[in-house]
Curated annotation (Swiss-Prot):
Gene name in the database record: kup1
Keyword check for Membrane: yes
Gene Ontology CC: plasma membrane
Name of protein: Probable potassium transport system protein Kup 1
Cellular compartment(s): Cell inner membrane
Membrane topology: Multi-pass membrane protein
Function: Transport of potassium into the cell. Likely operates as a K(+):H(+) symporter.
GO molecular-function terms, A-Z: potassium ion transmembrane transporter activity; symporter activity
PANTHER family documented for this protein: K+ POTASSIUM TRANSPORTER (PTHR30540:SF83), OSMOTIC STRESS POTASSIUM TRANSPORTER (PTHR30540)
Organism: Bradyrhizobium sp. (strain ORS 278)
Reaction catalysed by this enzyme: K(+)(in) + H(+)(in) = K(+)(out) + H(+)(out)
Length: 625
C-alpha cells in the first residue's frame, strides 16, 4: 500500500485499518506478557513480596508508557519520510542533510542490522513461550515442546514464498481476540487483589530500584521485554498511517497489556506459585488448552510480522545501495508489502531453529532477546535528537531535554541487558555486526566501482563525433544502455562499439537512481534530454520503497518525445568482474574479496530491472578496485 494513500484514511476505514494493524504491528509487543513477568520474577535474587511485585509492575507500566506511548506514538511517529517510518527511513530522511552524515548512517545501519537479530529471536522465544503452557496443562508433553516449536517454525518459514495474503485477513481478528482474552484474564487476577493498581504511582518503581540496588538494575533487563516490538509501531507506519496505529494502541493494545500485567502481579501478591509461567496461571484449568492454542496462533502472527518486516527492510537497504541485489518476489497483487526475499528467509530460518534447539527454553532466550532491541531503540533516540534539531528546528536545550530523557532510559535498559552477553546476548550482537559489516563493505565496493567507471568517461558529443569519423555502421532498431554514471557516454556503450563495431540507429542512455524518499510522484519519475539526433539520455528516479521496472518506464519515455521502437529494443548492461588494484590504493584485499563474492551472488541486473531476458546483451569487463 502506498504510504500516501494510507497516511490519512477516510473516517469509515479508520477502524478497519486499526483492526488490520492489530495483526501486523502489535503481534510482538502483544505476546510479551507470555514471558515478561515470569522473566522478571526469575531474575536472580528477585524478591516476591508485595512491595517488590508492585515495584516491578510499576516499572512495566511506566516503561510501556514512556517508551511506547511517549517516545514512539507521540514523537517518533511525527517524523515520517513521506509517510514511511522505521530506522532506515529516518536515516534516509536525515541523510538528506549532509552534516554529520557518517554518524547518521552508522546509527541507522547498525540499528537496522540489529533488527535481523530481533527477527531471528522473536519467532523462537514467542513460539516456545506459548507451547511451554503445555508444561502446566499436560506435564507429560514437556519433552515435545522444543520439537513442536521447531516443526511450527519450519512450517512458518516454508510457506513464506507462497505469501500470506490469503490468511492475512484473519490476523487482525485473531489478535483482537487475543487482546480481549488477555484483558479478561488480567481482570480475573485483579479481582483477587484490586489494590494492585497502586503500582500506577511511579514511586513504587523508583523505590524498588533504589532499595534493591544491583538486583533492581538487573531486573531492568527483564522489564525491558515488555516493550520489545514497540519499534514496529514506527516501522509499519507506511502500511497503515499513524492514525490507525494510534487508535489500535490506545483503544485496545495498551489497556489490554496493562490489565494483564496487573493481573499477573495481583496473582503473585495473592500467593500464587511463581514457578512455571505466571501468565497461564491466570487461566482456569478447563480453558488452559484453548488458551495455549490461541497463544500459539498469536505468536505465529507475531513471528510472521517480524519476518515480513525483515523482508521490507531488506528491500529498503537494497534500494538505498547498502545491500547487494537479491531476488524479491511479489507474493500478492493486493499490497506492495507482500514480498518474499528467499535469501533472508532461509538465513532467518537457520538461525531461528538453531536458537530454539540450542537454548531450549524461553527463559534462556530472554537473555539474548533484549540486548538487540534495546540498542536499536537507543540509536532511534539518537536519530530523533537530530530530527528535533534539523527538522523541527528545536533549540538545543529543548531537543536535549526531551531526547535526553529517552537516551537516559534507553541507555539504562541497554546497560542492564549488556550484563546478559555471556548468557546469549552475544548472538544478536554477532549477527548484527556481521550484517553491518557486509552492508558497509558492499557500499564501499559499489562506490569504488562507480568511481573507476567515472575515470573512463568521455563526453557523448565526443563519442558521437568519433563514431561519425570512423564511419561505424548503424543498424536498425533501438539500443538502451544502462549506466550508473551521471554524465558522459556509458562504458558499456564504448565496449559495445569496440567489440561489435556497429551501433543502433536510435540510442537511449538510461540511468536509474534511487533517492532517500519512499515514493516518487509520476510527474517526477523521468527526465529526458536529447543529446544528438536520435540520441537521448534519460534519468529515472525511484523511491526506496519502489521497484524499478524498465520496460514500463520506456513506455513513458516514448510519450515524452523519445522516438524509440518499443517492439525492437536491445538492452545493453555491463557486468564488472572485480579484481584488486595493483597500486595499493584500493580496498583492502579481504574487503575486495568479500565484495566480489557478494557481487557474483547478487541478482542479475536484468532481473532486478525486469528486463526481458531474450532482449538483453551483457558485456563484461574487469574493474580493479
Amino acid at each position: 500500500m502506498n504510504a500516501n494513500l494510507a497516511h490519512q484514511p477516510p473516517q469509515g476505514r479508520l477502524s478497519l485499518l486499526a483492526l488490520s494493524a492489530l495483526g501486523i504491528v502489535f503481534g510482538d509487543i502483544g505476546t510479551s506478557p507470555l514471558y515478561t513477568f515470569k522473566t522478571i520474577l526469575g531474575t536472580g535474587g528477585q524478591p516476591t513480596g508485595a512491595a517488590a511485585v508492585l515495584g516491578a509492575l510499576s516499572l512495566v507500566i511506566w516503561t510501556l508508557f514512556i517508551i511506547t506511548t511517549v517516545k514512539y506514538v507521540m514523537f517518533a511517529m511525527r517524523v515520517d519520510n513521506d509517510g514511511e517510518g522505521g530506522i532506515l527511513a529516518l536515516m534516509a530522511l536525515l541523510g538528506v542533510k549532509r552534516q554529520r552524515r557518517p554518524t547518521i548512517v552508522a546509527l541507522g545501519l547498525f540499528g537496522a542490522a540489529l533488527i535481523y537479530g530481533d527477527g531471528a529471536i522473536t519467532p523462537a522465544i514467542s513460539v516456545l513461550s506459548a507451547l511451554e503452557g503445555l508444561n502446566m496443562a499436560a506435564p507429560a508433553l514437556q519433552p515435545y515442546v522444543v520439537p513442536a516449536a521447531v516443526v511450527i517454525l519450519l512450517a512458518l518459514f516454508a510457506i513464506q514464498s507462497r505469501g500470506t495474503a490469503s490468511i492475512g485477513r484473519l490476523f487482525g481478528p485473531v489478535m483482537l481476540l487475543w487482546f480481549v482474552t488477555i484483558a479478561v484474564l488480567g481482570l480475573v487476577g485483579i479481582a483477587r487483589h484490586p489494590t494492585v493498581f497502586a503500582a500506577i504511582n511511579p514511586s513504587y518503581g523508583l523505590s524498588y530500584l533504589v532499595s534493591n540496588g544491583a538486583t533492581g538494575f538487573l531486573v531492568l533487563g527483564s522489564v525491558f521485554l515488555c516493550v520489545t516490538g514497540a519499534e514496529a509501531l514506527y516501522a509499519d507506519m507506511g502500511h497503515f498511517g499513524a492514525g490507525p496505529i494510534k487508535l489500535a494502541w490506545f483503544a485496545v493494545v495498551f489497556p489490554s497489556l496493562i490489565i494483564n500485567y496487573a493481573g499477573q502481579a495481583a496473582l503473585v501478591i495473592d500467593g500464587a506459585p511463581t514457578d512455571g509461567n505466571i501468565f497461564f496461571r491466570l487461566c482456569p484449568d478447563g480453558l488452559l488448552l484453548p488458551l495455549i492454542g490461541l497463544a500459539t496462533l498469536a505468536t505465529i502472527i507475531a513471528s510472521q510480522s517480524v519476518i515480513t518486516g525483515a523482508f521490507s527492510m531488506t528491500r529498503q537497504a537494497i534500494q538505498l545501495g547498502w545491500m547487494p541485489r537479491l531476488a524479491i518476489k511479489q507474493t500478492s497483487s493486493e499490497g506492495y508489502g507482500q514480498i518474499y526475499v528467499g535469501a533472508v528467509n532461509w538465513l532467518l530460518m537457520l538461525v531461528t531453529v538453531s536458537l530454539t534447539i540450542g537454548f531450549g527454553k524461553s527463559d534462556n532466550l530472554a537473555s539474548a532477546y533484549g540486548i538487540a532491541v534495546s540498542l536499536t531503540m537507543l540509536m532511534t533516540s539518537a536519530l530523533l535528537f537530530i530530527a528535533m534539531r534539523e527538522i523541527w528546528q528545536w533549540s538545543l536545550l529543548a531537543a536535549g531535554a526531551v531526547a535526553g530523557v529517552f537516551l537516559t532510559i534507553d541507555s539504562a535498559f541497554f546497560l542492564a541487558n549488556l550484563t546478559k552477553i555471556a548468557e546469549g546476548g552475544y548472538v544478536p550482537l554477532l549477527l548484527a555486526t556481521s550484517v553491518y559489516g557486509l552492508m558497509w563493505i558492499w557500499h564501499r565496493g559499489a562506490a569504488a566501482v562507480a568511481e573507476r567507471m567515472r575515470e573512463r568517461l568521455i563526453p557523448v558529443a565526443q563519442f558521437m563525433a568519433d563514431i561519425a569519423e570512423k564511419k561505424v555502421p548503424r543498424v536498425p532498431g533501438t539500443a538502451v544502455f544502462l549506466t550508473r554514471t551521471e554524465r558522459g557516454a556509458p562504458p558499456v556503450m564504448l565496449w559495445h562499439v569496440k567489440h561489435n563495431r556497429a551501433l543502433h540507429e536510435h540510442l537511449l542512455v538510461l540511468r536509474v537512481e534511487v533517492i532517500s524518499i519512499p515514493w516518487v510522484a509520476p510527474d517526477d519519475r523521468l527526465k529526458i534530454e536529447e543529446l544528438a539526433p536520435n540520441v537521448w539520455r534519460a534519468e529515472a528516479t525511484f523511491g526506496f520503497m519502489e521497484r524499478p521496472h524498465i520496460p514500463e518506464l520506456l513506455k513513458a519515455s516514448k510519450a515524452r518525445g523519445c522516438r524509440i521502437d518499443l517492439d525492437d529494443i536491445t538492452y545493453y548492461v555491463g557486468h564488472e568482474t572485480v579484481t584488486a588494484r595493483d597500486d595499493g590504493k584500493g580496498l583492502p584485499a579481504w574487503q575486495e574479496q568479500l565484495f566480489a563474492a557478494m557481487e557474483r551472488n547478487s541478482l542479475h541486473v536484468s532481473d532486478f530491472f525486469s528486463l526481458p531476458r531474450d532482449s538483453v546483451v551483457e558485456i563484461g569487463r574487469q574493474v580493479a578496485i
